[in-house]
Amino acid sequence: MATAQMHRNKVNSVALPSRVATETQSLILVKRLLAVSVSCITYLRGLFPEYAYGTRYLDDICVKILREDKSCPGSTQLVKWMLGCYDALQKKYLRMVMLAIYTDPEDPQTVTECYQFKFKYTASGPVMDFVSNNSNSVSTCSDAKKTSILLIRKLYILMQNLGPLPNDVCLTMKLFYYDEVTPADYQPPGFKEGTCEGLMFEGEPMYLNVGEVATPFHVLKVKVTTEKERMENIEKSIFKKQASKQPQTDEEKPDLSINDDLAQDNNGDRKRDDIETLKVEDLNLTCQEDGNLQSDDSQNSALADSQEKTSQAAPPAFGRKTRSGRIFQKPDLELKNQKESARASKGNQQARKPEKRSQSFEITGSQEDPAVAKRRKFSEPRTPLN
């Protein structure tokens, strides 16, 4: 019985490399972190149905992993986007993956929430914030695995506390490159040449630094940008002010970072019913040492749209419930406006809510990064939403 349980735990786990002594091991770690992070985001933001995910365990964390499912073309397409990311990552071309959520299918350049995964490639050792006095390979490996798990914990905490997205949203992905090493004609599988000029943010953006993971060969940073309204019900203890390394002007707003101590203190909270009672299913989005994923490579098959329109259930009158189980109460003013709108004629329905202002969206947003004015190469999914 004990042997069967050990085998079950092994099969149902997402293993991070116990050692990160080679570039291959580092690549596996970064790929798996990207897969788990994207799965966490899309699951807790309600972008795909429950059956599009399998349940696995990362250390003591129960995580949902996106998988290919014929009955959910959107999840299948996102898995293929991830394959394209892996191709660029393995070639050391990829600078950043931007997973963007927008509300208007006719205006994908105006986003309401986005997630940035930034990559650096280091050959002479990592640029770490957690420097050990005894700098040896064992310490480095241990720190990389520890910070990887901490990054996922912090991402889960943030996703479980953000206010809900609008009922109908669309999803897209944009890839950015290191132009000095990327061939001009290179495009990952499933992507085409794109543009990010004129990117706008719907509403007032809030920039959140989730964290970073460094190995001797890669550095991965994760940043989230969401609308300020979705932050109103989040406890202040979750965040800490980001210390700026450069003077800020009056117009600049400091980024917020997820509190490391809070993520570590919540270790025991991972066994809550809303996580642990989920059904165990097959894991399809796994990163093998050769970087291959099992998938159908046909570019011309009917894979639905690259930009997948998603829907959430209609909200109850008392508020919105997210997939994490948290209920967000609607302000009295909003409830009043909804009642007035219900009485209004159909011609006046557009006046239901005041139009949100859009602001130009700063893609890089990191004060540590050099100027990127010359970086002009972008990729976007090959098949746009019609």
Swiss-Prot record:
Which InterPro entries does the annotation name?
HORMA_dom (IPR003511), HORMA_dom_sf (IPR036570), HORMA_MeioticProgression (IPR051294)
Q: Which GO terms describe its cellular component?
A: chromosome; nucleus
Q: Where is the composition biased (Basic and acidic residues)?
A: 329-343
Could you list this entry's UniProt keywords, alphabetically sorted.
Chromosome, Differentiation, Meiosis, Nucleus, Oogenesis, Spermatogenesis
Does rRNA processing show up as a keyword for this record?
no
What's one Pfam family here?
HORMA
Which stretches make up the HORMA domain?
Answer: 24-224
Q: Where in the cell is it found?
A: Nucleus; Chromosome
Ranges of Polar residues composition bias in the record: 289-313
Give the span(s) annotated as Disordered. Answer: 237-274, 289-386
Could you state one GO biological process linked to this protein? meiotic DNA double-strand break formation
Q: What does this protein do?
A: Plays a key role in meiotic progression by ensuring that sufficient numbers of processed DNA double-strand breaks (DSBs) are available for successful homology search, promoting synaptonemal-complex formation independently and playing key role in the male mid-pachytene checkpoint and the female meiotic prophase checkpoint.
State the protein's name: HORMA domain-containing protein 1
Species this chain originates from: Xenopus laevis (African clawed frog)
